[in-house]
């Protein structure tokens, strides 16, 4: 049976480009499923329309249509995030992609983040470049991101090449991506580490590995890694946690580069997952140094510090 690739798009502004992408995929024997997240006008060509998406979310188009731009984008983003996992559970698609500008990419990525680990996801955007943050497109999920180089506005030799590349990647994932079970008879153990805690974590994992009872998975506690571990715990992919690096909590509390983990340690408690906690790196924060050499606190020279590289400085929170 042919695999199906879903395309999340705003057909009111990108219909021609979306249908071209669908034709590229269909010519290779794959099926397509177009998810229209338009917020302005209703057009044909979708497998599920904005009206149907909103209806599943509990909103009628008549109530949605008068909303302003910002409000309509916010509502449609939430509606798409609510509906996409339903569509996946219904078997509507195997891979999901989005090709467009900043607005479409942000909306599509928000929806993709609701899908489980290992469901292939690709966001291609003209804003996936430069100093833009990857948080809005990837966050703590396994989303592939591609810069489209040119704006996806019309079909030309550049945009068609980009669309072909994205579709080819999607077809490759549909054909060859696979998930692996844990080693037979072993529980999966998730552990956190950072450069300054890596020796301790690695020594602990070596001792655990010798027992032959666990498969170890290590997460870089960089503001996202801790969240990734906890997401996999929620999905039932991690059975035991060895949380040896907690400085994400410090950054979340007093500031620093590795922010973004404001609910750390909660998942194991909520899901009754065995967990050993060690306050590794709890007494430090990280600072990102930009190309102009800015980003460090004024009193940095009064504190113990280690430069991880030219861009990141590990700093003690006390003088």
Outline where the language-model segments fall.
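N-terminal phosphate-binding or glycine-rich loops at protein starts, especially the Walker A/P-loop
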Residues: 2-41, 95, 101-123
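Gly/Ser/Thr-rich loops at beta-strand to alpha-helix junctions
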Residues: 10-16, 94-107, 128, 190-201, ...
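Glycine-rich phosphate/diphosphate-binding loop of Rossmann-like nucleotide-binding domains
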Residues: 14-24, 33, 39-51, 184-223, ...
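Phosphate/nucleotide-donor binding subsite
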Residues: 44-92
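Cap/lid and interdomain-hinge subdomains that line or gate substrate/regulatory clefts
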Residues: 65-68, 131-196
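Short, acidic/small-residue loops that bind anionic groups at enzyme active sites
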Residues: 95, 107-137, 144-147, 217-221, ...
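Short Gly/Thr/Asp-enriched flexible loops that form oxyanion-binding sites at enzyme active sites
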Residues: 100-117, 201-204, 255-264
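A glycine- and small/hydrophobic-rich beta-loop-beta segment
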Residues: 247-319
